């Protein structure tokens, strides 16, 4: 149902939208007595839909910055009050939407939560400038330097540079 909603209905989620579709496309079938999994793999072995890409961008970009309650502002507020649990939670939500948009811009299904930085560096043709160093700064400072966290909305999420390709 989730793969149908995404792959055919082009419905976006807030983060990890195409993760189950990616798993279906890349899984190795070990046992499939009635060939149902194989049939699903054939059904969803289609090019990345433009409508899905657009839906993911439109659903997730406002949560990155510029809207209420955008995650960049929530991260800054949590950091300024010293609420480390909230910082962690907001950064995780931010990254879920961020990578959803990044993979959508690049027409890639979302590979899941593991090794996203490396996969993005290896496979994405559109990446923000200073992609890796921005994340290194984010992770090195997210619990120690609230001033650096304030730049998350401009430095790390420089995804707008990729959007004119699609709008």
Per-region residue spans from a language model:
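Conserved NTP/Mg2+-binding pocket subregion across the NTase superfamily
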Residues: 1-79
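Charged, amphipathic alpha-helical oligomerization/scaffolding segments
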Residues: 63-70, 93, 97, 130, ...
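Terminal (often C-terminal) interaction modules
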Residues: 126-167
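Charged/polar positions within long, soluble alpha-helices
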Residues: 73-76, 80, 99-110, 114, ...
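Small-residue-rich helix-loop
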Residues: 90-97, 115-119
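Short, charged amphipathic alpha-helical segments flanked by flexible coils
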Residues: 107-136
């Amino acid at each position: 149902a989730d793969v149908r909603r995404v792959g055919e209905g082009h419905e976006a989620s807030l983060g990890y939208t195409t993760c189950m579709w990616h798993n279906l496309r890349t899984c190795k079938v070990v046992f499939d007595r009635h060939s149902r999994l194989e049939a699903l793999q054939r059904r969803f072995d289609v090019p990345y839909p433009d409508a899905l890409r657009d839906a993911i961008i439109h659903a997730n970009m406002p949560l990155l910055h510029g809207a209420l309650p955008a995650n960049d502002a929530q991260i800054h507020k949590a950091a300024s009050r010293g609420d480390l649990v909230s910082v962690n939670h907001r950064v995780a939500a931010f990254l879920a939407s961020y990578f959803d948009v990044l993979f959508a811009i690049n027409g890639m299904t979302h590979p899941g939560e593991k090794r996203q930085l490396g996969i993005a560096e290896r496979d994405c043709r559109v990446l923000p400038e200073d992609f890796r160093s921005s994340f290194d700064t984010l992770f090195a400072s997210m619990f120690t330097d609230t001033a650096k966290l304030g730049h998350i909305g401009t430095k790390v999420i420089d995804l707008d540079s990729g959007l004119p390709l699609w709008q």
